[in-house]
Amino acid sequence: SQLNKIGDTLAGAADQSEDDNNLFEDVSDSDTDGDTEGKVFNCMNLGEVNADINAGGITGAMARENDLDPEDDTKTSGSSSLNVTYKTRIVVRDCINKGTVNVKKKGGGGIVGSMDMGSVLQSYNFGNLESDDADYVGGIAGQSKSIIRRSAAKCRLSGDNYVGGIAGSGFTITGSRSFVLADGDEYVGAIAGGLESSNSITNLNSALQDSESEQSGNYFVSETLGGIDGVSYAGQAEPLSFQEFCDLTAQEGMPDEFRNVTLNFVANQVTVEAVTVEYGAAFDMANAPELPVKGGYTAEWSDFDHDHVVFDQTIEAVYTPLDSVVQSGDTRNGLPILLAEGAFGTAEVT
């Protein structure tokens, strides 16, 4: 019957899908220093990235192409066999992003927007992710169905659903560090907003237990966030005090940015001074740098919460044009009775 034919067709498609999965072996996680193919290594991005989907500071997506050309895309060695397995390698290693990443719809990451396969190893992100309406936003990867190891993020994150310090949604995440401010609607976490499958937390736990490194596990510092979707897990997505986090990242040789809270005072897109402050302390505006003078304008630093500083901030100089003429409040026949000419700031007019 036609129903039987349809059933056979669907069963055949499922078998073909299973065969395709067995045909490819991802060897990215066994990367060594001597491996050079299928690898992005020691790269830095400082530029702004803008995309609708899959926006990343280093790469947009890590996935296998649908079309495979056996002649050009594969290497053969040894005797011929009907049982063929293709080994694939997609590795991003020792890369740094400092550029802002903007994604409109889905998949924004400091290093990679979307990971279907491959590994991100020992990579850092310091670029903010500005994606108020997008799903899957992460400090390292927006959406990862694969492996992230020994990576770290310090940035501001904004998104809709699935917003995470390391991955918006992740699978295997080990040995990673997060110091972020994250804002989202649902599924928000300092390590991951969510996990890619119901057994991901088991997979994560097994990976941590099997690790021989003393720095196994994922750690973060935050006064407001939980580790994974608002919940912290000892040894897997665990909070530390700021001092403990500083000691750990120093021991691991991570960049100084992970141990500093900095106020950047900027005027006309030029940094006037970068002031390092103590985590959680108040900043006295009397210690702010002198504002650069701009003829015909008054100047002040933009307002910010300086009573409890827990993250880097950029404070912009705000310039307001001086009034060249001021008038009295008293009028005669609807006109001011007195005009004064000069250069007046708002605070000088009473």
For every predicted segment, state its role.
Residues E252-V266, P292, F304-D330:
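Conserved "repeat-terminator" motif of extracellular CCP/Sushi domains
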Residues G38, I90, E212, A281-T314:
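Surface-exposed interfaces of beta-sheet-rich extracellular modules
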Residues S131, A182, N264-G280, G329-F344:
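Short, solvent-exposed loop/edge segments of extracellular or virion-exposed proteins
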Residues V49, V101, L129, T271, ...:
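Residues that cap or initiate secondary-structure elements
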Residues E348-T350:
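Extracellular, surface-exposed repeat/solenoid domains
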Residues K106, V270-T276, A282-E290:
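A generic structured-segment signal
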Residues S222, Y279, P321-D323:
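Non-catalytic surface loops within mature trypsin-like serine protease
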